[in-house]
UniProtKB/Swiss-Prot annotation:
Reduced FMN (FMNH(2)). This is Chorismate synthase. Residues 266-290 are annotated as: Disordered. Disulfide bonds: none annotated. Belongs to the chorismate synthase family. Gene3D superfamilies: Chorismate synthase AroC. PROSITE patterns: CHORISMATE_SYNTHASE_1 (PS00787), CHORISMATE_SYNTHASE_2 (PS00788). Its EC number is 4.2.3.5. This reaction introduces a second double bond into the aromatic ring system. InterPro entries: Chorismate_synth, Chorismate_synth_AroC_sf, Chorismate_synthase_CS. It holds the Pfam family Chorismate_synt. One of its GO terms (molecular function) is FMN binding.
Length: 365
């Protein structure tokens, strides 16, 4: 089972939903980087369960413990080990699901592959695995901010069939976090919250779309062919639980345009290190390499698989059974997935920033 990601800026996550702890080993972070531990904790608080009445009622503090790699606010260049202890597990909620495969959940496929699985809390398939990613991503965000002034902003664009149209020029973290659903449109966010509450009362769930904008992206990140920047971003984001789709730039809507309509024309720039364009249908990446424009992406999340309605399924013996899930689950994963998206984008960009310096700086400088 692969639990590691990245080439130079490399993360390895560990732990399970109902185990003793979850965490991450971050290797390859440059030394002497100033790290604000509070910013790491802030990101974990944004993904923490029990933060509102539209998320899972599981109540975890998710307090970060730094075990190694950071001393007096500076990175040492050695592996950074970070840990969060699980304190509010209820494995008894899963007794009736021990050998029953939840529809559209990882239970069945894990059993087919390994012949054994940690059914309690979903094990490694649980979103608690992403705690390590978010902690490491918070370090990556500080690296990107320090060296490039890069800003990563993600927000909930759509919940179920309730969509928003956000002005990307005016988007800010303050606006995103101004409500519990993390949609920076006050009117639409109210509708989204009511829809989630309604589905929660019905024992059901919903999915939606998260949009991500990256500002102040260095040009030259990414490589041709197999290590294209958008390919690595897609892999990173599609590795998150419940993801089912990825778009960059114009995405699928670009297929309705002609080449003359879709092409991003280059224009003169005062900064010779960047290529400015009149439009951004490419989403800031061309030929697999960043051009310096904003990176714009959308990520689709399916409805939460574990719901409170009775469903038909089979057990490990292949017998048909009826099941109604217990446990504490998000009726919609998107509000808490926003910092997860931020984290994975930050990890990819930090890794490619270091790769670009390793390959090109000796010659270009």
């Amino acid at each position: 089972m692969s639990s590691s990601f990245g080439k130079i800026f490399r993360v390895s996550t560990f732990g399970e939903s109902h185990g003793g702890a979850v965490g991450v080993i971050l290797d390859g972070c440059p030394p002497k980087l100033k790290i604000d531990i509070n910013l790491i904790q802030n990101e974990l608080d944004r993904r923490r369960p029990g933060q509102s009445d539209i998320t899972t009622p599981r109540n975890e503090e998710d307090k970060i413990e730094i075990l190694s790699g950071i001393k007096e606010g500076l990175t040492l260049g050695t592996p950074i080990a970070m840990l969060v202890r699980n304190k509010d597990q209820r494995p008894a909620d899963y007794n009736n699901m021990e050998q029953v495969f939840r529809p559209s959940h990882a239970d069945g496929t894990y059993h087919l592959k390994y012949g054994i699985q940690a059914s309690s809390g979903g094990g490694r398939a649980s979103a608690r695995e992403t705690i390590g990613r978010v902690a490491a991503g918070a370090v990556a965000k500080q690296l990107l901010k320090t060296f490039c002034n890069t800003e990563i902003l993600s927000w909930v664009k759509r919940i179920h069939d309730i969509d928003s149209d956000i002005n990307k020029e005016k988007i800010s973290l303050k606006k995103i976090d101004s409500n519990i659903v993390r949609c920076p449109d006050e009117k639409v966010s109210t509708e989204m919250i009511e829809r989630i509450k309604e589905l929660k009362r019905q024992g059901d769930s919903c999915g939606g779309v998260i949009e991500c904008l990256v500002r102040n992206v260095p040009s030259g990140l990414g490589m041709p062919v197999f290590d294209k920047l958008e390919a690595d971003l897609a892999k990173a984001l599609m590795s998150l639980p419940a993801t089912k789709g990825f778009e960059i730039g114009s995405g699928f809507s670009g297929t309705y345009l002609k080449g003359s309509e879709h092409n991003d024309s280059f224009i003169k720039s005062d900064d010779s290190s960047k290529l400015r364009t009149t439009s951004n249908n490419s989403g800031g990446i061309q030929g697999g390499i960043s051009n310096g424009e904003n990176i714009e992406m959308k990520i689709a999340f399916k409805p939460t698989a574990t719901i409170g309605k009775e469903q038909k399924t089979v057990n490990a013996e292949g017998k048909e059974v009826l099941m109604k899930a217990k446990g504490r689950h998000d009726p919609c994963v998107l509000p808490r997935a926003v910092p997860m998206v931020d984290a994975m984008v930050a990890l990819v960009l930090a890794d490619h920033l270091l790769l670009n310096h390793a390959q090109c700086d000796l010659i270009n400088n």
